[in-house]
Amino acid sequence: MAGPIREKIRLVSSAGTGHFYTTTKNKRLHPEKMETKKYDPVVRKHVAYKEAKIK
């Protein structure tokens, strides 16, 4: 049986606070890196979050 299609990813804050969210995405349908605006509680603002690998 094949492995899971959805892979776990980490969304890291571009504000440099070290805050991150974890989520999953379908690598086959969306091979590009994910980028979205989310709330960063450290700076108390919405900032861009970029995809990074989970170590």
Swiss-Prot record:
Is Ribonucleoprotein there in the keyword field?
A: yes
- Know the name of this protein? Large ribosomal subunit protein bL33
Is Ribosomal protein one of the keywords?
Answer: yes
**One biological process GO term for this chain?**
translation
Annotated Gene Ontology cellular components are: cytosolic large ribosomal subunit
Q: Mind telling me which Pfam families this protein's record contains?
A: Ribosomal_L33 (PF00471)
Q: Note the InterPro entries from the entry.
A: Ribosomal_bL33, Ribosomal_bL33_CS, Ribosomal_bL33_sf, Ribosomal_zn-bd
**Which keywords does this chain's UniProt record carry?**
Ribonucleoprotein, Ribosomal protein
Q: What molecular function terms (GO) are annotated for this protein?
A: structural constituent of ribosome
- What's the encoding gene here? rpmG
Q: Output the superkingdom of the source species.
A: Bacteria
Family statement drawn from the similarity comment of this UniProt entry: Belongs to the bacterial ribosomal protein bL33 family.
